[in-house]
Amino acid sequence: MHSNVSSLINDQINNELYSSYVYLDIANYYESKGLDGFANWFEIQAKEELDHALLLYKYLQNNGQKVTFEAIKKPECKFDDNMSPLQEALRHEKFITACINNIYAAANSDNDYRTMQLLDWFVKEQGEEEKNASDLVTKMELFGD
């Protein structure tokens, strides 16, 4: 594995941990509004993001690569209504998709087929995550705040 791909995967571990923070922040918002169903859904999403980070962490370890941890920034989300957390989730999923695509392109450029095989799962997962986030935005638009 080239150092560039390893570095990008290390960055993605941090991105996934940050994603977990973002979703916990959103869950906290909905919990404070008494919207337990939304809160629960985002708590589950937060756990999934942590699982993604652990998968990448183990992948680097199992391939003899150094894992480096960076500070996880605080989510800067300010929610004015019940729609804005859903829009933030969709925006964030699109960001994560772009990051995964960037790693995939680097792995492809390096003929790193093992990493590409791992990332195939992430590419599929991101398609599902973006659809779920988009569906929630659409439903909130239909039913109102």
Task: Spell out what each predicted region is.
Residues 1-145:
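Iron-associated oxidoreductase/ferritin-like identity signal
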